[in-house]
């Protein structure tokens, strides 16, 4: 059975790249009737925080990504990691390295001065017992390093990239698998070792992650072999790039799922877009689909090797499509909390009125957040912008508004009645209909742009806001 995992580190909020990796893993599991599980990699004690774990889990749930088992907490498995390191030490496949940080820095500086790539020179690979005893007598602590054969050619078949090979000589020398500790102890186990141990313990069959892990995969394959563990298959997906073609990072501003959510993007649009970041849907499917629909056809043959450039226009288009498809009641459920957060008084408005407002605004929305500013004139009396003020100075504009105002009563307007009042006021002031309509929009909305005027007027009339605004505009 296919079993895949997402293994986020809770050192920050859910990044869009991590979320895209989650989407690909989830799609692959669902396509093959397998399981999608989580592992929280919280071994960075200083930076890992429970609030980040909560943010990651909440973000996945919001996107519609569910998991099939309780999340594994990596820090609770340290003893299993140390047992694996001890196994490698006992087999002579790992050793203790007493090189100090100062010595290692000097080594790297000398290499760079000679225009060589920095790497560990394996200086403590074959220490004698006497040499080890001397270092211990000095009070030196030791890391644990895994032996890497420079002549080894590491090969695997990548589900995205095909045949892959990596030279052992390009892995930077013998790899540290445990932090510095007294020589009779094993320090904190490090990433490449713990990932291998945990993936094997969790029966992971496919490791799906970003291409920035390719070098790690070469190292991890050696560890799988040394520990006698079954190999998973690997798929390295393209990185998400910014508009300049560089890896998307915090310097680009919006990178976390929380940011997108706060800006008013919907979960379905964001999940839809992340699926398209590096995957091409089959011909005829189009670009608008749900995760469930994508799961029926997802495969790695359609995952691109090249980096996926983040396209804000496409995301905005998808989000607009989602919002336009929402019914008024559903859109109201999404917008009302935002209106209340903005300080709009919604409690005095009926559900029917709020839903009519949503129906009016819906077709013009790209983001949910757009619905706040577009709705503002329906809750707060706007000041007249310059274009509205200029319109009211047009010949006959104020006379027509006065005629219209005099015909209004406390009774709520109906559409046909409103049209008749407009016609009568135009005749009374001897102006063209366009003059009055623009002037009425300026008086009601504070500007000459906005949603359908007649529907806007009827909503404001129903809320008892139209006569006061017209009167105020007339001065």
From Swiss-Prot:
- What are the recorded GO MF terms, alphabetically? ATP binding; glutamate-tRNA ligase activity; tRNA binding; zinc ion binding
* Top EC class for this record: ligase
Which top-rank group of organisms is this from?
Answer: Bacteria
**Motif 'HIGH' region per record, residues:** 8-18
Q: Where is the short sequence motif 'KMSKS' region located? A: 247-251
Localisation: Cytoplasm
Residues that hold ATP according to the record: 250
Q: Which family does it belong to?
A: Belongs to the class-I aminoacyl-tRNA synthetase family. Glutamate--tRNA ligase type 1 subfamily.
Q: Which GO terms describe its biological process?
A: glutamyl-tRNA aminoacylation
| Enzyme nomenclature, EC number | 6.1.1.17
Q: What does the record give as the reaction this protein catalyses? A: tRNA(Glu) + L-glutamate + ATP = L-glutamyl-tRNA(Glu) + AMP + diphosphate
Q: What does this protein do?
A: Catalyzes the attachment of glutamate to tRNA(Glu) in a two-step reaction: glutamate is first activated by ATP to form Glu-AMP and then transferred to the acceptor end of tRNA(Glu).
Q: Name the keywords, alphabetized.
A: Aminoacyl-tRNA synthetase, ATP-binding, Cytoplasm, Ligase, Nucleotide-binding, Protein biosynthesis
- What InterPro entries does this protein map onto? aa-tRNA-synth_I_cd-bd (IPR045462), aa-tRNA-synth_I_codon-bd_sub2 (IPR020751), aa-tRNA-synth_I_CS (IPR001412), aa_tRNA-synth_I_cd-bd_sf (IPR008925), Glu-tRNA-ligase_bac/mito (IPR004527), Glu-tRNA-synth_I_codon-bd_sub1 (IPR020752), Glu/Gln-tRNA-synth (IPR000924), Glu/Gln-tRNA-synth_Ib_cat-dom (IPR020058)
- Assembly behavior: Monomer.
Q: Per the record, what is one GO cellular component? A: cytosol
| Protein name per the record | Glutamate--tRNA ligase
Q: What is its main location?
A: cytoplasm
